[in-house]
Design a protein with these regions (language model features):
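A polyanion-binding, active-site-adjacent surface
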Residues: 2-110
Length: 111
């Protein structure tokens, strides 16, 4: 039997203009309670490169770069059953309420 896993709360504030959506956190992200925590995931390296920042593993610095650049992150799936981290293994998913999030944060201009 597969365990049911849940997404993190959105990282967003009133100044957020861009919303980046993932599927649902993988095993490593769930363990660390951090978005995109697996070292092989390129998300953070791309963000640092995009904004000409020196790469760091420090999660608070990573989150501050998103905030400084008005970027929000969340997942399209609120909860699901999944063995491992592969999206192809997702079963019985329930969607996050993205429409409600966008209504609450009208400054979002791009997803």
């Amino acid at each position: 039997m597969q365990n049911r896993i849940s997404s993190f709360p959105p990282f967003i504030d009133e100044q957020s203009e861009i919303l980046i959506l993932g599927s649902i956190p993988g095993v490593k992200s769930l363990e660390k309670q951090q978005y995109y925590a697996h070292p092989q995931n390129k998300f953070w390296k791309i963000i640092f490169e995009l904004f000409n920042e020196k790469f760091t593993e420090d999660y608070s610095v990573r989150i501050n770069i998103l905030k400084k650049n008005h970027i929000a992150i969340w997942d399209v799936i609120d909860s699901c059953e999944r063995k491992g981290s592969l999206d192809s293994e997702i079963k019985n998913e329930e969607a996050n309420q993205i429409g409600e999030l966008l209504e609450s944060y009208p400054n979002i201009q791009a997803i």
